Amino acid sequence: MENTQSSAKTPKLKLDFKDSKYATGRRKTSIAKVWLKKGSGKIYVNGKLFTEYFADETHKMQITRPFEIINQATDYDVRCSVKGGGPTGQAGAMVHGISKALVLFDENLKSTLKTEKLTTRDSRSVERKKPGRKKARRSFQFSKR
């Protein structure tokens, strides 16, 4: 019997990322591995264009923000592998990784990106639920009588 699944799979996207800079970004529970190189402004996330991967416009704008700040929106190609979390955490992790990779390309961008707080890891995460409470801080409804 032949394996029909292997022939039905779509071919893997081959991207040449030699001479690229690598950085990791984190947000909430998401981790993004980012490869950045000089190019034409294409951004790939897990093998797809970022416009296909992220449905929400705010996430798309958030990802392009580091390039808009340095006025080089079409000068770099990005390949990113993202794991964990949801779309907001993944977009935030990508921004963190892209910003760190841009600094590796040009040290002069560090102060610009740092003032916008893009190279700093956003350490906010979900607070754990406490015993005796409904959620992390919300108590159960109190009744006097």
Predicted regions and their residues:
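N-terminal intrinsically disordered, low-complexity tails
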Residues: M1-L13
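Structured, basic alpha/beta domains of bacterial-type, RNA-associated proteins
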Residues: K12-R26, A32-K83, T88, G92-R145
